[in-house]
């Protein structure tokens, strides 16, 4: 993931639970702040407790660094923000209508974006704050189809936007195999398995159709043999009989 963060300005991650992504992103934020001047990094979380926990991870990394490596010193810190002597800062806030809107951001991180309240409106307000070259890392487990996060990720997979899609299933963890999966899923519903482990949009939300039904429909669905018309919106599954 770190190479993706460095090589792509916009990254969107669809992930399984408990892979350590939030911890990795916290470490990446510290690296950006220490080795580059005047970095303005904003993390948006689903609630205040999650935002404060992110800053605790940031502070843990800072405390574990040797003094010779921590060249810029910490000049201010509280439960939601850390500021460095080189002008960089890391701030974590809960979701709100005006979160980050008045700032020019170097890096925007949205944690569990599929569960962020009013993420559609929030993203519309935040995107302009990255116009001066800022980067974005949006990460989440799935939460059904139709929301802004789902749209951004699926468009990224189709290369219809600027995001680099990253999909991390449960088995990317080096200590998780089939035995772990079988044990972990014994007391989970199909929806929980789809959401927490399989990164399945369709089965993770409160959808009318089950995944089994969708799979059957996919098998029965046939692609048209020909398309025509000004906008290619006339589809043929069989050619008409000629008299």
Located regions from the model:
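Phosphate/NTP-binding elements of NTP-utilizing enzymes
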Residues: 1-243
């Amino acid at each position: 993931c770190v190479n993706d963060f460095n090589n792509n300005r916009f990254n969107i991650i669809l992930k399984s639970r408990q892979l350590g992504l939030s911890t990795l992103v916290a470490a990446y934020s510290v690296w950006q702040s220490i080795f580059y001047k005047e970095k303005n990094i904003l993390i948006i979380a689903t609630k205040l407790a999650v935002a404060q926990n992110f800053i605790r991870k940031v502070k843990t990394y800072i405390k574990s660094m040797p003094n010779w490596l921590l060249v810029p010193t910490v000049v201010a810190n509280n439960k939601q923000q850390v500021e460095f002597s080189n002008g960089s800062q890391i701030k974590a806030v809960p979701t709100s209508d005006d979160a980050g809107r008045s700032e020019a951001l170097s890096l925007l991180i949205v944690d569990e974006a599929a569960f962020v309240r009013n993420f559609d409106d929030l993203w519309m307000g935040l995107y302009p704050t990255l116009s001066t070259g800022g980067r974005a890392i949006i990460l989440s487990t799935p939460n059904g189809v139709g929301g802004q996060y789902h749209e951004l990720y699926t468009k990224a997979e189709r290369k219809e936007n600027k995001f680099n899609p990253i999909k991390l299933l449960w088995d990317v963890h080096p200590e998780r195999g089939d035995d772990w999966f079988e044990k972990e899923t014994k007391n989970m519903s199909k929806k929980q398995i789809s959401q927490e482990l399989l990164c399945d949009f369709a089965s993770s939300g409160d959808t009318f159709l089950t995944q089994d039904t969708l799979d059957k429909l996919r098998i029965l669905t046939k692609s048209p043999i020909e398309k025509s018309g000004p906008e290619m919106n006339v589809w043929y599954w069989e050619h008409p009989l000629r008299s």
